[in-house]
Amino acid sequence: MNDLMEKLKKLLPTGNSPVLLLSIATGFIVAFLIAGFETLTDDLLLAEISSRPLWQIALAPGVGLLLAVSIIHFFGKNSGAGTSDEFVKAFHERKPRLPLRDLPVKLLAGAATIGLGGSLGLEGPSIYAGATTGITLSERFKNWLRREDIQVLLTAGAAAGVAAVFKAPATGVLFALEAPYRDDVNRRALLPSLFAAATSYVTYINLVGTKPVVPFLNDPEYRIGIDLKSVQVGSGESMAWFDASKLAELFTGVETGDLFGALLLGVLAGLGGRSMAWLVRWSKTQSRKTSFVPRVFMGGLLLAALAISADAAFGSPLTIGPGIEAMEWVVSPENGLGLIALLFGLRISATLVTLAAGGVGGLFIPLAAQGVILGQFTGELIGSDRPGLYLSLIHI
């Protein structure tokens, strides 16, 4: 076996070629892992739970927490509920290590948490899957790599995970390079991350399709500066058209009210981000300090109460899941400020309770949902005739 490995090693060119080849392999493997994870979590579990009677929907997050915490406790071997933060932690270690045996544990715990209604996102387990795949390949082929290539493949794997789950390769690269805050490694990891993210994205969309993660944001009404109300648009089965002389009217100018709204939104988002960071740290501390049974029981009870409250207020248990349904609900022009503010409070409470109870998942999608709710609230508060503008701004 050693002779075979030596012969293969001689066939490979020196320099960056091995790490680039392994980055492509990482992206390919990660795409399959995340496609399976998303299908189980979103298309099978969460879709099934969402169609059940309210009492079953309300109880499901508690069952998911029980399963997730049990999986971590009995099969994790000292592994906690962390996902994307484990990637950052491993990156800063002298010898990064994410055991492959923990990967199925994290994915199953994440599927139980999110698929049964916990208010966390798919991106956390996806980043963990990518980082673990990258570092595992670097260990298997360490004789072909330089020592610093371990962190490079770790970063490339995380980029592949984000690129797949968000169907956005550029987002994957930016996240993976910025999250660890280490410029010298980021420069070396740029090209491998691009290779891994592109491979993961192309493979993933061929497996699951190109449906946007947040479909309504593709609507032109929610794009910056576009005002479809002022132009008559015709449409056919496969195209839309308008009078060329009306083209200038399609793009509205920036008004003083828009600038004030953007300033207000920036202040609110900044304050909210700082507050949320503190609350997340507090929730994770409670998860570590409180014993197994009380935190799962209280977490399930609180999530059930939040789901029932949301159903009473909005006609749907919008606290369930990562928050896509909540985003789709909040953009309706019929919703008043009071209901939008209530949804903001209920959603953030559900996310914090899921974390404190030991749920496994990411925070990016739930926080993006909070951003959409906050953007719509700001637009309605200042009486904007284009509240969708602030949904676009919050994603910038």
Positions of PLM-derived features:
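Alpha-helical transmembrane segments and immediately membrane-proximal extracytoplasmic
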Residues: 1-394
